[in-house]
Amino acid sequence: MNIRHQLVQFLNLALVLSSAFMAWKTLSVITNSHSPIVVVLSGSMEPAFQRGDILFLWNRDNHAKVGDVVVYEIKGKSIPIVHRVLREHHNAESKQFLLTKGDNNAVDDLGLYAKKQAYLNQKTDLVGTVKGYLPMVGYITILITENIYFRYTLLGLMGISSLLSNE
């Protein structure tokens, strides 16, 4: 392989990666969410959502309602949680606070929240409200995360494929 051919392959890869990044950022701006698409990682929302379902989020609503399925993050933890709004209340400044619970869980999420936090702040803790989903499409993400053999096999196949491609 000559250097020119390698440069073309590198630039094509850079184009694909930058296009994917721009599409993600555009979707983030449109939905007003830093993570507009998430994968369900646990069974806490069964039967509504199964492990591996991809959820599409929207964060342009001013308030979440009781019964809405929301995705939130807890300060200091990196994994978003998908649960249903169980209760809501407003303070004197009309800020909305939410209590959530997984459909398949026996108790509410109070034990999951940060210390001394009784409710989620709708403005700061919510990633978005679920507006749609694709069943089981995100299961590949779970396989890559949880199965080291699958991860390295997939990486190896991608590497071999890129080495053997002529375009």
Curated annotation (Swiss-Prot):
The chain crosses the membrane at residues 13-30. It catalyses: Cleavage of hydrophobic, N-terminal signal or leader sequences from secreted and periplasmic proteins. It holds the Pfam family Peptidase_S24. Residues 153-164 are annotated as: C-terminal short (CTS) helix. The keyword Hydrolase applies. Keywords: Endoplasmic reticulum, Hydrolase, Membrane, Protease, Signal-anchor, Transmembrane, Transmembrane helix. Signal peptide: none annotated. It comes from the Eukaryota. Residues 31-167 are lumenal. Its main location: endoplasmic reticulum. One of its GO terms (biological process) is signal peptide processing. It is a single-pass type II membrane protein. Residues 1-12 are cytoplasmic. It is found in: Endoplasmic reticulum membrane. One of its GO terms (cellular component) is signal peptidase complex. GO terms for molecular function: serine-type endopeptidase activity. It is an enzyme of class 3 (hydrolase). Its EC number is 3.4.21.89. Belongs to the peptidase S26B family. Catalytic component of the signal peptidase complex (SPC) which catalyzes the cleavage of N-terminal signal sequences from nascent proteins as they are translocated into the lumen of the endoplasmic reticulum. Specifically cleaves N-terminal signal peptides that contain a hydrophobic alpha-helix (h-region) shorter than 18-20 amino acids. Component of the signal peptidase complex (SPC) composed of a catalytic subunit SEC11 and three accessory subunits SPC1, SPC2 and SPC3. The complex induces a local thinning of the ER membrane which is used to measure the length of the signal peptide (SP) h-region of protein substrates. This ensures the selectivity of the complex towards h-regions shorter than 18-20 amino acids. SPC associates with the translocon complex. This is Signal peptidase complex catalytic subunit SEC11.
